């Protein structure tokens, strides 16, 4: 929802914590433009203003009305047009009408051009239906209202996307690893699926789907479905997803990719130059699947494959079922960042199998997944490894909540009325959610808690759930059966109160005490820890070493670190995102050119936004950031582009910041 230390000694552990390797925190992205009114085969009225959130009573982020009618199956027949940067074709919906009085089908769209809407009687006869496409809301897109007085069992929509669709990125060959063929991919979470398919774009609705996709014959097309590793690259592809999924898990990609098997049910797709390296990096995937199955039951999605995308992918990973999307920034040669796989794999139970019913309950996806990820880590790599990850995560969370509104610090968020769900997501959902489950585990013991959690997954498989439903399940299946172990007030403190409860046990890593001692010794004497000490450090220890530095250091101190560990120019994004901001704040100018090259080359939001944020605090930094952004923009994903553009605009509009105090020699 997605980097080792290139110049630092080899890693002792191949996992990295969520806050380091699996930041799939969603980017706030909305398209300001309003698409032209679509032509109508059967004219209908057009709304005169965007429909506001108070008209959406089930999910504040969707116009859909699933209490009246739901999509049960989606059949796509699409053509990919790389020249026009568009997807076009038809979407056929099999519907279940829940209300006999319902006369309309309402769908979510964003920047879609709707050519026609038809009712399908199932016998080959299509009849036009009236529809109205409302003007666009900048966050939620356009409400598509289809008049369906006879409640047809199937509806067919002919449409095409805009080149600026927020959920799609089209890359020129020069932006790929191979430099020969174009590449495209989707990112549907949280509410971007509506930019490439008209849908009930809410996680409360699940549907099966099939797809027929045509493209130029020299690219391979893949979807979050049953991709055939032996499929011919011929420009004509068919897919089927037999398990019901929510709209945000609908995914497509096309490019010059080849397949490398890892196990009988798992493998990796990547550009040819990256394929062998990716397969080697992810070779422990089958062990991870086995560890998760032992804890939480069988993997229910058939295959678990991964697709390594170009560097412009804005996240670390995306848990698209049967085809996890992954950033290439985790392919570093030492397996130090493959916790991304553990996190996205964990979503196969928490998120994909049991899904938050709306984005205000996203902790049910991300908190559970972070907890499951930690259990996989512990099963494969030991208790101390998991404890280090928890301590890093918890420290990052405690720092983040200091600047958050109290309501945003609760796990059960208030309704997201008129609020982009991307912007509402924070480490609270991930880390506080996992911390709550760890608290329950500690109180009840694993012999009780593990069967409870597996029961939650089994009893709600292929369903969406709310926080209230989880609390009911918790009461009936855990608290009531084991009275006087956890109180309702304690549960309330986790779910509805800001901050972390005072009774929460914090993670404590023994390994980090050695790192702290080494850092303190260097700060006092100027003597860096010996290779005998650092040779035993893994990625977590190095990140902890850098994260514990003060806000600024003397330039000569940074130079000493740089000459010893070669942080400047590292391809390790996790180090880069910590090193470059520290260098910029401290006036260590030797690092600035490499910082610029890094943000021009990498489009992953987690890695580049902290560097932009630090640059934008000074006038010369703003100028430098603008120059780098102009070079990077052609290869950035629309989500990253929107985030950086907003940051720059705010920085230029703000009064000049006071200069950072520099350490005195």
Regions found by a protein language model. Give the residues of each.
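Acidic/His-enriched low-complexity segments
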Residues: 29-302, 444
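Mature, folded catalytic cores of secreted/periplasmic enzymes
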Residues: 62-70, 75-79, 83-86, 92-94, ...
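Hydrophobic alpha-helical and helix-loop surface patches within well-folded domains
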Residues: 33-42, 51, 114, 239, ...
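Long, ordered, helix-rich scaffold segments
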Residues: 426-428, 432, 460-466, 478-665
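Gram-negative bacterial Sec-dependent N-terminal signal peptides
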Residues: 5, 9-30
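Short, glycine- and charge-enriched coil/turn segments that flank and shape catalytic ligand pockets
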Residues: 99-101, 121-125, 150-151, 229-235, ...
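Hydrophobic pocket-lining residues within nucleotide cofactor-binding pockets
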Residues: 112, 244, 330-331, 584
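Intrinsically disordered, low-complexity segments enriched in small/polar and acidic residues
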Residues: 6, 38-41, 46-47, 182, ...
């Amino acid at each position: 929802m997605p980097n080792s230390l290139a110049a630092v000694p080899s890693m002792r552990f191949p996992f990295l914590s969520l806050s380091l390797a699996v930041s799939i925190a969603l980017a706030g992205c909305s398209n300001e433009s309003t698409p032209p009114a679509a032509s109508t085969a059967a004219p209908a009225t057009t709304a005169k203003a965007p429909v506001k959130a108070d008209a959406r009573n089930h999910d504040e982020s969707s116009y859909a009305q699933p209490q009246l009618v739901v999509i049960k199956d989606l059949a796509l027949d699409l053509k990919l047009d790389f020249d026009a940067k568009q997807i076009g074709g038809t979407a056929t919906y099999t519907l279940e009408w829940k209300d006999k009085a319902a006369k309309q089908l309402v769908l979510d769209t964003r920047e879609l051009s709707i050519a026609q809407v038809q009712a399908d009687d199932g016998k080959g006869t299509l009849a036009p239906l009236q529809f109205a496409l409302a003007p666009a809301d900048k966050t939620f897109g356009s409400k598509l209202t289809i008049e369906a007085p006879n409640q047809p069992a199937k509806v067919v929509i002919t449409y095409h996307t805009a080149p600026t669709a927020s959920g799609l990125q089209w890359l020129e060959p020069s932006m790929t690893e191979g430099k020969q063929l174009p590449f495209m991919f989707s990112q549907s979470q949280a509410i971007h699926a509506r930019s490439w398919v008209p849908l009930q774009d809410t996680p409360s609705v699940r549907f099966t789907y099939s797809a027929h996709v045509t493209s130029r014959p020299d690219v391979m097309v893949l979807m979050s479905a049953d991709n055939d590793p032996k499929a011919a690259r011929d420009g004509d592809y068919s897919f089927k997803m037999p398990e019901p999924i929510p709209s945000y898990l609908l995914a497509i990609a096309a490019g010059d990719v080849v397949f490398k098997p890892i196990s009988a049910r798992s493998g990796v797709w990547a550009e040819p130059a990256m394929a062998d390296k990716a397969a080697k990096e992810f070779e422990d995937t089958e062990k991870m699947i086995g560890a998760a199955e032992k804890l939480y039951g069988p993997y229910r999605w058939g295959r678990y494959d991964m697709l390594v995308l170009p560097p412009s992918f804005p996240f670390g990973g995306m848990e698209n079922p049967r085809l996890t999307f992954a950033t290439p920034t985790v392919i570093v040669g030492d397996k130090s960042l493959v916790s991304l796989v553990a996190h996205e794999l964990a979503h196969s139970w928490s998120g994909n199998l049991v899904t938050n019913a709306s984005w205000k309950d996203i902790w049910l996806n991300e908190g559970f997944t972070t907890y499951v990820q930690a259990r996989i880590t512990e099963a494969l790599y030991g208790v101390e490894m998991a404890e280090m990850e928890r301590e890093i995560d918890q420290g990052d969370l405690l720092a983040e909540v200091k600047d958050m509104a109290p309501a945003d610090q609760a796990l059960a968020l208030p309704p997201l009325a008129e609020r982009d769900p991307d912007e509402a997501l924070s480490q609270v959902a991930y880390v506080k959610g996992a911390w709550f489950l760890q608290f329950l585990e500690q109180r009840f013991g694993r012999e009780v808690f593990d069967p409870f959690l597996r029961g939650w997954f089994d009893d709600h498989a292929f369903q969406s759930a709310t926080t209230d439903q989880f609390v009911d399940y918790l009461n009936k299946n855990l608290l009531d059966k084991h009275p006087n172990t956890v109180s309702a007030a304690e549960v309330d403190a986790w779910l509805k109160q800001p901050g972390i409860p005072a009774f929460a046990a914090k993670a404590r890593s023994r390994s980090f005490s050695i790192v702290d001692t080494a850092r303190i010794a260097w700060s006092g004497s100027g003597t860096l820890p010996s290779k005998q000490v650092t040779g035993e450090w893994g990625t977590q220890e190095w990140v902890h070493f850098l994260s514990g530095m003060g806000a600024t250091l003397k330039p000569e101190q940074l130079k000493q670190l740089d000459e010893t560990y070669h942080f400047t120019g590292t391809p390790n994004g996790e180090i880069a995102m910590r090193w470059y901001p520290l260098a910029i704040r401290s006036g260590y100018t030797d690092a600035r050119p490499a910082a610029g090259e890094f943000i021009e080359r990498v489009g992953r939001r987690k890695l580049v936004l902290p560097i932009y944020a630090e640059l934008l605090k000074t006038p010369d930094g703003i100028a430098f950031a603008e120059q780098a952004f102009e070079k990077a923009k052609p290869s950035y994903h629309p989500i990253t582009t929107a985030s950086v553009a907003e940051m720059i605009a705010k920085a230029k509009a703000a009064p000049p910041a006071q200069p950072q105090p520099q350490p005195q020699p």
